[in-house]
């Protein structure tokens, strides 16, 4: 049995309505996946749960899916942010894809003293996040923030949201202990540094903030995207 393709759409989803395919979605379904009129597709929009639909109209560059019935109700997902230093194209694409698959709700790229790239194509990252959500089965697509300097992000940090700093110096408690002590507070964030690590002044600045908790991931030095 052929597995059903999942597509993210922005339309409201309810039984009986028809959803217009974008040109890109049409190309993917018809020319890449070889779907035909009458084939079933799964749709989600991050608000109304997951729905089963059927290809009702297929034209040269457009098409429509009629919504049949709901497969899953929308449920509250973990609200975990990932604050990470900007990376080059390949690594930042990898981070976006894997963080989306793991359920991160928002990705916040930041510019640090040792950041080796300050340019990013946000539209490309949003597409990667959307495709990862479609593939992995989650019901939402994570948000992606405009890159800002680390200090800007932290100076406007939302009240009540904790930040777990992955400290490559090994000064913090093991991350397993930190997360156990916090009983995983929904509404936290994790902060990852750049290649070469945070500068000493950046570490000192962050550790003096009341909402920051340092955590160690062990003695091994990992790649920034890992």
Label each region the model flagged.
Residues 200-226:
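Structured adenosyl-cofactor binding patch, chiefly the S-adenosyl-L-methionine
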Residues 1-73, 123:
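N-terminal positively charged helical leader segments and presequences
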Residues 12, 70, 112-115, 219:
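Short, ordered loop/turn segments at secondary-structure junctions
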Residues 188-205:
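A C-terminal functional module that forms or caps the active site or interfaces directly
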Residues 162-163, 185-191:
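Residue-level preference for the first positions of well-ordered beta-strands
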Residues 72-165:
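RNA substrate-binding interface of SAM-dependent RNA methyltransferases
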């Amino acid at each position: 049995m052929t597995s059903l393709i999942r597509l993210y759409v922005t339309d409201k989803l309810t039984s009986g309505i028809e959803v217009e395919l974008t040109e890109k979605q049409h190309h993917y379904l018809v020319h890449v996946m070889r779907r035909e009129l009458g084939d079933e597709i799964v749709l989600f929009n991050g608000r109304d749960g997951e729905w089963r639909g059927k290809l009702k109209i297929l034209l040269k560059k457009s098409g429509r899916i009629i919504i049949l019935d709901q497969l899953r109700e929308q449920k509250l997902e973990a609200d975990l942010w990932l604050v990470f230093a900007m990376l080059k194209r390949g690594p930042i694409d990898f981070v976006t894809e894997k963080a989306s698959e793991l359920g991160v709700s928002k990705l916040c790229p930041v510019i640090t003293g040792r950041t080796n790239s300050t340019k990013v194509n946000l539209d490309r990252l949003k597409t990667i996040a959307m495709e990862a959500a479609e593939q992995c089965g989650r019901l939402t697509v994570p948000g992606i923030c405009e890159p800002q300097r680390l200090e800007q992000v932290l100076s406007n940090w939302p009240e009540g949201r904790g930040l777990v700093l992955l400290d490559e110096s090994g000064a913090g408690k093991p991350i397993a202990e930190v997360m156990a002590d916090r009983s995983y507070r929904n509404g936290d964030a994790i902060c990852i540094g750049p290649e070469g690590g945070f500068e000493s002044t950046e570490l000192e600045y962050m550790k003096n903030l009341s909402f920051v908790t340092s955590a160690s991931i062990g003695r091994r030095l990992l790649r920034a995207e890992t």
